[in-house]
Amino acid sequence: MMANASGTGQAFNILIVGQSGRLQYEAVLFAASLRHSDPGFAGRLFVAEPQPGPLWRHDPRITDPAVRTLLTDLGAEILPFDSRAFGETYPYGNKIEALSALPEGEPFVFFDTDTLITGPLSQVPFDFAKPSASLRREGTWPSIELYGPGYGAIWKSLYDRFGLDYPTSLDLGHPDEYWQRYLYFNAGWFFYRCPRQFGARFLSYATEILSNPPEALVCQTLDPWLDQVALPLVIHSLGGGRQTLPPGLLDGSVSCHYRTMPLLYARESDAVVAVLETVAAQNAVKRVLKDHEPFKKMIYQPKGVAVRALFDRANLPRREQVIRNTIKREGLWVR
């Protein structure tokens, strides 16, 4: 049985990726925070697990048996999938390829695994016919060269490649050649009414961009930005766009894409830290998370308090890199 989304009458599944290394521990924290913050969520939480194959040099599956057991105890379903296009050379592609393993025709919400659920997700009024994604981002792509094409030429070349209407994607509230004028998301969350339709288009667009980029992309790097280059094209092609959700819910009161523990302690609200520390204090969760050194240091030692003391949340540096560099100078950066 899946949860009903308030305001839509539709049910939905949740997808995150879990594999060896830090993502397996982040998956535990995600699942535990979902259970804590939305105990009424009756849906299915899928933890997609890439399987060994020719695109992986090492076994990518979850290595810690305690993680696997706890995820199941928290109500998650571990969902194997095969890597046919990306694998180890582009692990961000897991979010693209995992979509094909979800139940067809059932609405889904994808979250990056380094996300904390902080409120009742089941009450978010998703309109699954109008896909969208996170606007908590910086202008990371494209990188404009002095004598190269500008934002408009680069993005238009991509819309033209896939036969999409470019002008309707623009936010005319921003000036020409300013990055926010162009449809650009953080791929930390996105949603749609059918994962397989979304995933097939995402895979098609991403692989085409990678193997046969338009000439305007000649100066651009696609690693690690490929998913965020293809995502706005997919969303626009499926009738979605910016802010098809009420503001302040995802990336607000209901979810926090923390990225790393030092960044969470540096910039997130007291409410987010309270959810983190309440969830992490549960004995079953604590026993598992302490095996991941960054969580052990930040949450339990607790170095996160020292990171938090470095910053004024009411006056944070505008650029994330400045925050990262400050933490690194103090010897407190871990991931």
Predicted regions and their residues:
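A glycosyltransferase accessory/donor-loop signature
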Residues: 2-19, 171-188, 193-335
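A conserved donor-nucleotide-binding helix/loop in the catalytic core
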Residues: 81-111, 116-119, 123, 133-136
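A structural signal for short, well-ordered beta-strand segments and their strand-loop junctions
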Residues: 46-48, 109-112, 117, 133-135, ...
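Conserved glycosyltransferase catalytic-site signature
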Residues: 24-28, 92-96, 187, 224-229
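Short, surface-exposed amphipathic charged segments that create phosphate/polyanion-binding patches used
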Residues: 91-98, 148-152, 260-264
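N-terminal anchoring/stem segment of glycosyltransferases
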Residues: 1-85, 104, 222, 297-335
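Charged, glycine/proline-rich intrinsically disordered loops and linkers
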Residues: 56-71, 146-174
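Conserved donor-nucleotide/metal-binding helix-loop-beta segment in metal-dependent transferases, i.e.
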Residues: 117-157
